[in-house]
Amino acid sequence: MGLNYPVDLEAWHAWQQRQNTLRWVKGRAQNMVRARRGAQQGMVSGVLYTRGAIPRVLIVLDSFSPTSRNALLEPLKHLEGVGVALWCPSDASAYLNGQYASTRYSRKDWNAAPIRADELAEKLPGVRLVLSLGHYLPRGHAAYRFARERGIAYWVVQHGLLVPHAPPLPIGSTLLAFSDEDAQFWASGRRDVQTHTVGSQLLYRAIQNTHGETTKSLGKILFLGQMHGAELPRASFARAAHSFLKRHDGIYRPHPSETDKLSRATHALWEIEGIAIDRSTTPLNEVPNPVVSVFSTGVLEAAIRGIPAWVYHPNPPAWLEEFWARYGMNRWGEDPTPAPEQPAVEPAHTIAQLIIDYLEAY
């Protein structure tokens, strides 16, 4: 099994927009606005941060989400001797200190300036490698065009768990994957894509943060919401959660993205039926309750902490069963999901070393 759209990015975008009629209409309107705005203002822009005399690596962020920061900024700790440029959507100074800064560089060592996509070649003549999450978002796509036009390597870092609905990899790219199985899944038989297995920085850090200790499980089962997702129909996510919660007297924890009117109405209806809704802001990695979900990463994060965790769906499609097997997630009624094995070397360090090796061989 592999991707539904292993090569065609436009077909993937079209599928994504069609998943929800309201989302599709809204997306069409937003795209028209962006197109008009783009014609007036030029093209994709952002803030360019540079350190070192001549940047050799361009790291591209389309957001500052935790998964994006873990995948793309953590390697900075191990790239002290390499000139680096960061292309970000907005001010990133808060993320260029502390855990993402090395001992050699700190926030004050970065120069910042606004930049448009058509200025990349002029301002970054020494770049030999682009690192991103893929070419399916604006900056990642613009950086891919920049790389293709100049014959520059384009590397994609896996930042989340893979489903068949994931976007295709760019033609001629190099994938840095969580596992050999994920590399094979995302490449989907393509011969133009090279792969390296590096592990998940997010899960690696979760293991390090436990300090070898486990958390005592307390309280009712939390069902982790995913009604915002496009991988399954909203009704399928809702049916899985509702049937489980009514049967096992659990608590529903909405995903942070479940803020639309339909999601809020669903939460309110469930409360009338007697289903408890967790509206707290306590981070999931601090919650002691056992967890269940359809396929949330939170299942693996809970397992790492020693918290009992399972997956559940009353009628899972074949791809979901394959997903559960690939990530070692156990179904409700089986033993709790075991903590995933992690590499001996920090993934961010492995990524940095691969970059250094590539630049030295260039």
Which residues make up each language-model segment?
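Donor nucleotide-activated moiety binding/catalytic core segment of transferases
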Residues: 258-305, 309-310, 315-316
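Catalytic binding pocket for nucleotide-activated donors in carbohydrate/polymer assembly enzymes
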Residues: 172, 193, 197, 297-350
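Catalytic donor nucleotide-activated moiety binding site of glycosyltransferases and closely related
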Residues: 90-101, 137, 246-278, 325
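Conserved catalytic-core segment of nucleotide-activated headgroup transferases in glycan assembly
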Residues: 68-76, 198-268
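Active-site and donor-binding regions of nucleotide-sugar-utilizing enzymes
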Residues: 2-10, 42-52, 58-201
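Short acidic, S/G/P-rich loop/turn micro-motifs used as interaction or catalytic elements
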Residues: 63-68, 93, 136-139, 227-233, ...
